[in-house]
């Protein structure tokens, strides 16, 4: 139960940095402005909206970190660096249990779909970057549950089944 490196954790770190910038407990950061814009409220009035939004909502603030980092914000850059390092640590831990090299790791989630984040994770792997092949799934994670249910119902799983899912599934 570790969310280090996740969109939620990066979004939560963005909000923490924004509030620390806002109230003077931390360095000034572009995240203060970007998070306030995303909230559509002044930071001083936004706490209820953040808590009501839950984890998925908080994860949407991860994209403010990318924008701030592109603008040269050191705080945002640090958040992204920490996230990439955390994900690389997860992958290193997994490599201990897999003998194949390169091991294949399927990565998914809103944040890791960004090519820049994926490249940061590869870089954070350092000398072990050739020990793991990072791939993105071509179907949503829920596809696995659908396959299980279809098999239980005696429905054959064919390439047409998969292509129909890819064509029709919308979150």
Pin down the residues of each PLM region.
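Hydrophobic alpha-helical segments and helix pairs
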Residues: 1-21
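ATP-binding/phosphotransfer module of carbohydrate and carboxylate kinases, centering on a glycine-rich
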Residues: 15-171
